[in-house]
């Protein structure tokens, strides 16, 4: 009998017709049954006369399935056994305690993400370099696009395109004649015929991230386009959405981002986004994380289909500092996926220091939110992590990994901003409000040489000094009552107090 792990993928492969246009003229689906669940999912055409249906079981035990479709060979049946998960298989990420995340097996998930918009579309050498960096454990979520990207530093064509056809000539593209807005002439696509190889590349990336314990935050649509993918009509969009959902939804580490900078996609209206969201909710039986990302105006994150807020800063100076306000407003996890990138390009969204990006991560985390990384350093190869992946050159990734280690030590699940002085941000466990025995006092760009603390008489508190930049934790002893803790007098320090 076939076996698969709980939250793994069971795939049924069927031979069928290849004549005509199987993407629009044929269909296949399957129903999977066990004593605990009954799930029906759509399949997809994978090219060369092969049709596939994928399923992610949520329980252990015996399953049976039946496939049906528009062609005789689509009718089949079978069974398989689902075994206990192993290794880093903790299931899909879910919302936990309103503002936080946990895997389905209840293991806490503290998001420390990064952005590599077009890494799935790069040559093999760049792809391998990206994986080598990810192996260092800096991040546990990556944002990336299904469609290729047209933007500065992104004039090369991708390795594959999502549709059959030919692209506009890019040989004369330069920074001098680059435009965000193009008329799409010169492209010749058949938007009813997918290129399965393009989507297999995406699936390879999803699996490679999964093997490393990294969530795949898939950006389904985006505005940076010279090929016409951002201005397809509703029928073409629906065909695309259904195909993507059928192919990707069974992977446990998938998150759905309906769009990156949705407000720049002028051809799409509010009713379009709500339509895509409705389709996604109906067709994804696993209820993966769902959001939509802004350039300037936030989407209405109170919408019930949105599981978490995927935010880009709206102000040059103040953004993650609003985390507590947005938690209160939206009653959902706050994920700052774009807060400017470490780098040195000419634009302000891509030239902050590693120290500043690390500070923003800490400010978001201490307020009960989460943040995202990106890197945009100029280099002779014109390979920038924010889009292509490749090699990391910045100083923040190791500090972000260190922060994640601190977050995983939180009692209970998740932090929240607690009461503190005007010149500090104090984080306490969300589950332990109002009485807590755990506090992190973060001083950001302040440079105190000492701090005074007052605790009730008779209570003992273990004190640790955290240097968030040099990544050290120094034991400062056990104290009670009123006491003073010496600090080195430089930025990015924190003091952790734990009642013992």
Write out the residue ranges for each language-model feature:
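Solvent-exposed strand-loop boundary residues in beta-sheet-rich modules
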Residues: 34-36, 71, 467-471
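Active-site mouth of glycoside hydrolases
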Residues: 33, 87-319
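Aromatic- and carboxylate-lined catalytic core of secreted/periplasmic carbohydrate-active enzymes
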Residues: 2, 342-345, 357-477, 485-500
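Extracellular glycoside hydrolase catalytic/binding regions
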Residues: 239, 253, 260-395
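Short beta-strand segments within Ig-like beta-sandwich modules, predominantly Fibronectin type-III
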Residues: 43-45, 476-479
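Extended acidic/polar, glycine-enriched regions
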Residues: 37-98
């Amino acid at each position: 009998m076939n076996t698969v792990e709980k939250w793994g993928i069971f795939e049924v492969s069927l031979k069928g017709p290849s004549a005509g246009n199987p993407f629009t003229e044929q269909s296949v689906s399957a129903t999977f049954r066990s004593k605990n669940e009954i799930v029906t999912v759509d399949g997809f055409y994978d090219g060369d006369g092969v049709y596939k249906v994928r399923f992610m079981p949520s329980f252990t035990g015996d399953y049976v399935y039946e496939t049906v479709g528009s062609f005789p060979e689509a009718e089949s049946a079978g069974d398989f056994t689902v075994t206990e998960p192993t290794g880093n298989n903790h299931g899909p990420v879910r919302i936990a305690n309103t503002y936080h995340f946990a895997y389905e097996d209840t293991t806490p998930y503290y998001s420390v993400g990064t952005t590599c918009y077009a890494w799935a579309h790069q040559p093999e050498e760049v792809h391998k370099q990206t994986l080598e960096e990810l192996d260092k454990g800096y991040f546990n979520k990556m944002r990336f696009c299904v469609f290729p990207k047209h933007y500065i530093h992104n004039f090369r064509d991708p390795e594959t395109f999502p549709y059959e056809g030919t692209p506009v000539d890019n040989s004369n593209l330069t920074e001098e004649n680059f435009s965000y807005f193009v008329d799409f002439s010169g492209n010749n696509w058949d938007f009813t015929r997918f290129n399965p190889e393009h989507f297999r590349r995406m699936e390879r990336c999803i699996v490679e991230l999964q093997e490393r314990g990294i969530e795949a935050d898939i950006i389904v649509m985006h505005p940076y386009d010279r090929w016409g993918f951002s201005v397809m009509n509703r029928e073409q969009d629906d065909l695309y959405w259904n195909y993507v959902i059928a192919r990707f939804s069974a992977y446990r580490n998938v998150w759905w981002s309906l769009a990156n900078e949705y407000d720049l996609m002028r051809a799409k209206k509010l009713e379009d986004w709500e339509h895509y969201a409705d389709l996604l909710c109906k067709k994804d039986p696993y209820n993966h994380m769902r959001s939509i990302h802004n350039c300037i105006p936030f989407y209405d994150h109170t919408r019930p289909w949105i599981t978490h807020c995927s935010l880009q800063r709206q102000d040059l100076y103040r953004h993650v500092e609003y985390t507590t306000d947005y938690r209160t407003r939206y009653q959902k996890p706050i994920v700052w996926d774009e807060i400017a990138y470490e780098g040195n390009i000419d634009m302000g969204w891509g030239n902050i220091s590693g120290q500043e990006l690390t500070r923003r991560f800490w400010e978001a985390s201490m307020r009960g939110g989460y943040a995202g990384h990106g890197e945009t350093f100029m280099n002779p190869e014109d390979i920038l992590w924010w889009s292509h992946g490749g090699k990391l050159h910045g100083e923040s990734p190791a500090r972000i990994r260190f922060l994640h280690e601190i977050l995983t030590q939180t009692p209970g699940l998740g932090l929240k901003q607690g009461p503190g002085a005007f010149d500090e941000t104090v984080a306490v466990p969300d589950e332990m409000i109002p009485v807590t025995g755990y506090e992190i006092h973060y001083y950001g760009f302040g440079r105190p040489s000492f701090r005074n603390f007052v605790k009730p008489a008779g209570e003992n508190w273990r004190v640790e000094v955290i240097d968030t930049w040099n990544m050290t934790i120094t034991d400062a002893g056990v104290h009670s009552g009123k006491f003073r803790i010496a600090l080195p007098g430089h930025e990015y320090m924190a003091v952790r107090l734990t009642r013992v």
